[in-house]
Amino acid sequence: MMFNKQIFTILILSLSLALAGSGCISEGAEDNVAQEITVDEFSNIRENPVTPWNPEPSAPVIDPTAYIDPQASVIGEVTIGANVMVSPMASIRSDEGMPIFVGDRSNVQDGVVLHALETINEEGEPIEDNIVEVDGKEYAVYIGNNVSLAHQSQVHGPAAVGDDTFIGMQAFVFKSKVGNNCVLEPRSAAIGVTIPDGRYIPAGMVVTSQAEADKLPEVTDDYAYSHTNEAVVYVNVHLAEGYKETS
């Protein structure tokens, strides 16, 4: 049987009218299509919203050599240094706690979350317990230079991670300071502690007391992951350069 285009057109028109009359198609749909929408409203790099604790929107400051994947989000008072690689689905969201800082040559890999507890109350006063100080400056989250934040890891402020440190896959840092040249192996966690320089947390271990943190093993030359971060930083710096050239 041959298909009758005229009958098909009539059927489609009838169905459209029926749906519109039943309310299944919103009258505002046409308005949405016609509405002029700026790119900024849907940008993955944008200002934080105005809130009771923060009446001023702030836009991220990103070094021109850094690469932010279109599927990553960078929001609010965020500073991103030179040659930083931010991979797909990473979220750097400075809308509650602020500011967030990511140092030179660091990498924020797929699915990583950087966020923080509220750092300013509704009276505009700082919440000291939710702030970390690094070199005389205050942050909600601080990530040093040459740091690797591996896939799906989270650093939730107040928190700071020192230079040349590797935060492994699905590792977690909260209300903590992690020193320089440290390693958090996959699925390990530092909660409410200070990890001394040059220490590592074994895979799956959750460190919640300073006594535990002070007894952590040292990163030595024969430690399995002693040079992992160096290699990961090298790769991601070149990935950032490559993606910048093709974007």
UniProtKB/Swiss-Prot annotation:
The question of whether Signal is a record keyword is answered with: yes
Could you tell me what this protein does? Reversible hydration of carbon dioxide. Important for growth on acetate. As a probably extracellular enzyme, it may support a H(+)/CH(3)COO(-) symport mechanism and/or conversion of CO(2) to HCO(3)(-), removing excess CO(2) produced by growth on acetate.
Q: What is its EC number?
A: 4.2.1.1
GO MF terms here are: bicarbonate binding; carbonate dehydratase activity; cobalt ion binding; sulfate binding; zinc ion binding
Q: What is this protein called?
A: Carbonic anhydrase
Q: How is the cofactor bound?
A: Binds 1 Zn(2+) per subunit, at the subunit interface.
* Gene Ontology cellular component list: extracellular region
**Keywords from the UniProt entry:** Lyase, Metal-binding, Secreted, Signal, Zinc
Q: Which organism is it from?
A: Methanosarcina thermophila (strain ATCC 43570 / DSM 1825 / OCM 12 / VKM B-1830 / TM-1)
Q: What class of enzyme is it?
A: lyase
